[in-house]
A protein has these predicted regions:
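N-terminal Rossmann-like dinucleotide-binding module
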Residues: 1-7, 83-86, 177
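Rossmann-like dinucleotide-binding domain that binds NAD(P)(H)
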Residues: 135-220
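Residues embedded in well-ordered beta-strands within globular domains across many folds
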Residues: 28, 106-109, 138, 193
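N-terminal glycine-/serine-/threonine-rich beta1-alpha1-beta2 phosphate-ribose binding loop
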Residues: 1-52, 58-76
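A contiguous active-site-proximal alpha/beta segment in oxidoreductase catalytic domains
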Residues: 49-51, 57-136
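Short, solvent-exposed loop/turn elements at domain surfaces
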Residues: 2, 21, 116-119, 145-147, ...
Length: 220
């Protein structure tokens, strides 16, 4: 494929072939979202440590299977919320908690604002690019016709393969709150209020592009 032509690293069409290589100690999983959990579990079963991009899963159940596998196979697994490595977050935590510069924190709010254009809406299904092994690309996802204009990237806004903006950027900003404000002591929410929708565009996307979520954790 194009990647094999551009880079000198060995290329694989099927990740399972890579996982069989005993010389590989760890893998970074940067597939489409719908593959994250299964690929991570396969890697751990093969004895590899894992860095898996966010979002980890489509559901709590899927995510728990990855946690269970990490404990079963005693492997290191890191989720791709890379802003935790930013020294600024440590400074903000010190500002809030050690210095108590703002006093007692009672409430935390995260916002993500960014323009996102229409992905289009075709009258006929999108032809799959010839260079794509579509069965392998789909993996655990449903085989459904695609009506968006572009095959690549815009799978984010299809619940079958993506997780919408909440799974794309929401993961990052919510993890910032969990890390900085809660210091990872946040409990499972007692109540969740979620509202929003797909506004402005009548396109093929089925995930919200405007989304408000309130988590009542009772942690503060």
């Amino acid at each position: 494929g194009k990647a094999a032509e551009q880079y000198k690293a060995k290329a694989y069409a099927d990740m399972r072939e890579l996982l069989e290589d005993p010389n590989v100690d760890a893998v970074a999983i940067a597939t489409c979202n719908h593959w994250h959990c299964l690929a991570a579990i396969w890697a751990m079963e093969a004895g590899k440590d894992v860095y898996v991009e966010k979002p980890l899963s489509h559901s709590q159940w899927e995510g728990r299977q990855v946690v269970n596998a990490a404990r079963k196979y005693k492997k290191i697994v890191q989720l791709g919320t890379q802003q935790r490595s930013d020294p600024m977050q440590a400074e903000v935590k010190k500002f809030l908690h050690e210095d108590q510069a703002l006093g007692k924190v009672l409430y935390a709010q995260a916002n993500r604002l960014g323009p996102r254009g229409s992905i289009g809406k075709r009258e006929t299904p999108l032809p799959i690019p010839q260079e794509i092994d579509y069965d392998t690309w789909l993996g655990p996802a449903q085989d459904e016709p695609l009506y968006r204009n572009s095959f690549h990237y815009d799978w984010h806004w299809d619940w079958n393969t993506g997780s919408g903006e909440m799974g794309n950027w929401g993961v990052h900003v919510l993890d910032d709150v969990r890390n900085v404000a809660y210091q990872d002591s946040v409990t499972t929410p007692k109540r969740i209020l979620s509202c929003g929708g797909r506004v402005a565009w009548n396109d093929a996307g089925d995930s919200p592009n405007v989304h408000y979520v309130y988590f009542d954790t009772g942690s503060f």
